[in-house]
Amino acid sequence: LDLSWSCYAAVNTVDKEILQKMGQAGCWNIFYGFETAVDELAKNILTNRKNTNLERMKQVAQWSREAGIEIRGSFMVGMPGETPELAKQTIQNAIDIDPDYAQFSVVCPFPGTQLAKEIKQGKWGKFISEDLEEYNTMKVTWLPFGYNSPEQLENMERYAYRKFYLRPSYILRRIAKIIKTGNITDLIRHIKGAIALVKGSYLIPISKKKETIKIKY
């Protein structure tokens, strides 16, 4: 069958042989939940951490490239126990793994999760919003003890995107690919993305106070 498909995967669920077969079967893109390779942070939030160190992540990324599969990766900032210095280590993880596209999200302690309960008990940090409408990974709804203000955490997410996407090596690689494919739509999309990165307009700003929908944890 002539199929083109994509999927999500964890780095400890694939190997070189599986990725080769996936590529041969039409898989063109895998979204990996890398999150972080900083052990000090991963142990606080990730339960299944076997074979999830930085070297494993880099190896899986290389196997994916060899199989002709595009790599998208998710990375987190604002993790329990995080400081700005540790967040920068996670950002460096992303650069070392070097996926085709990286998504940086703020940890969001959704109601009912173990993390939300622990924060409510005074562990890890404090909530800064109880508005259910604000609970997504693009908004800062809680503040780890390692940060001084919500703005500092929001700025860290902005820094992550700029640090990853505005690298000369990354820009040149994307330009080379666009020239090779001749995809004008892709070129326009990348230009708009670059402008948004410089302006910081790709993030949802911290909301002003308004009537909120209170959450019970």
Predicted regions and their residues:
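Detector for C-terminal structural segments
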Residues: 181-184, 192
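Residue-level signal for secondary-structure boundary elements
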Residues: 165-172, 183, 187, 199, ...
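A structural motif corresponding to the C-terminal lobe/cap of the Radical SAM core domain
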Residues: 1-182, 215-217
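Short linear elements at protein peripheries
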Residues: 189-217
